[in-house]
């Protein structure tokens, strides 16, 4: 399953030579009109495991879909990685559990990932991230003691 904004698809032909392929485009110029979830539903596709990469809003939707369908889901996160070894914490994402390295609810995308089981990480919207930063909290605890 591949999703694109429009007909400017890439790798579709190459990937299609290895497996059956469904395509969704937001404008409907190729394949199903809409998101990858629209195509999955329209074509009645099923899976035991989902592997996803792409923009955060899409990953949030895939994560929610997988949880509702009881499907194991792995997501690949894209973050800027300053040091690449986990020391600077510049690539952290919010996580469900406390990280042993930093003692906060973060995962280091460069060191712990970039691929995570979907329910291990929180996929915050830009607004949610902004609210946490303005509140002075990047650890996910929002100043609350456990």
Question: Which residues make up each language-model segment?
Answer:
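Iron-sulfur (Fe-S) cluster-binding modules
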Residues: 9-12, 18, 40-47, 105, ...
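Amphipathic, positively biased hydrophobic alpha-helical segments used for protein targeting
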Residues: 14, 65, 95-97, 121-124
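FNR/FR-type flavoprotein reductase catalytic core
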Residues: 1-82
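Local cysteine-cluster metal-coordination motifs and their immediate loop/turn environment
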Residues: 56, 79-115, 138-145
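Short, surface-exposed amphipathic charged segments that create phosphate/polyanion-binding patches used
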Residues: 37-41, 87-95, 124
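Residue-level recognition of conserved structural "scaffold" positions that shape functional pockets
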Residues: 10, 61, 91-93, 120
């Amino acid at each position: 399953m591949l999703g694109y904004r429009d007909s400017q698809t890439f790798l579709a032909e190459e990937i299609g030579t290895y497996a059956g392929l469904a395509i969704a485009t937001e404008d409907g110029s190729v394949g199903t009109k809409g998101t990858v979830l629209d195509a999955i539903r329209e074509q009645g596709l099923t899976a035991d495991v989902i592997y996803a990469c792409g923009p955060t809003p899409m990953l949030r939707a895939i994560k929610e879909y997988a949880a509702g369908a009881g499907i194991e889901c792995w997501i690949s996160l894209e973050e800027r990685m300053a040091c690449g070894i986990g020391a600077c914490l510049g690539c952290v994402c919010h996580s469900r559990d406390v990280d042993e390295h930093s003692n906060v609810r973060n995962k280091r995308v460069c060191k712990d990932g970039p691929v995570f089981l979907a329910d291990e990480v929180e996929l915050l919207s830009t607004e949610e991230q902004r609210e946490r930063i303005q509140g002075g909290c990047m650890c996910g605890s929002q100043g609350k003691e456990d």
